[in-house]
């Protein structure tokens, strides 16, 4: 499939901030996430960098979706003013996840685009 025809790509183009995404994933995202579009879901992205992906996912999933971002950088909290929930923490720490899930509850989709070292991914 041509990634430019995907709903993910269309949402990517609408992002309010810089969004770094590899287009070769867009077909996969559409295949996996299409069933969640325009539904009341909780979506969590680990690693939000400049925040653009939050807007991309908001465009993709629709207004019913609860979009949550996790990052190490405290400056990421600035995106809360746009209706996103932002948590600052280290994805490699069990203590972070324990607190996170206690507060958040059930999550429908988790996308890990955070740390790229072995200890952060295992």
Task: Name the predicted role of every residue range.
Residues 1-111, 115-122:
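A short alpha-helical cap/connector motif
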């Amino acid at each position: 499939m041509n990634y430019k025809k995907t709903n993910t790509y269309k949402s990517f183009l609408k992002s309010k901030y810089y969004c770094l995404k590899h287009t070769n994933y867009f077909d996969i995202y559409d295949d996996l996430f299409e069933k969640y579009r325009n539904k009341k879901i909780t979506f969590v992205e680990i690693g939000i960098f400049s925040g653009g992906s939050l807007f991309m996912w908001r465009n993709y999933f629709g207004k019913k979706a609860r979009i949550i971002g996790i990052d190490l950088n405290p400056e990421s909290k600035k995106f809360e003013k746009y209706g996103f929930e932002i948590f600052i923490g280290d994805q490699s720490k069990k203590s972070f996840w324990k607190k996170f899930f206690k507060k958040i509850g059930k999550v429908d989709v988790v996308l890990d685009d955070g740390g790229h070292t072995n200890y952060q991914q295992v």
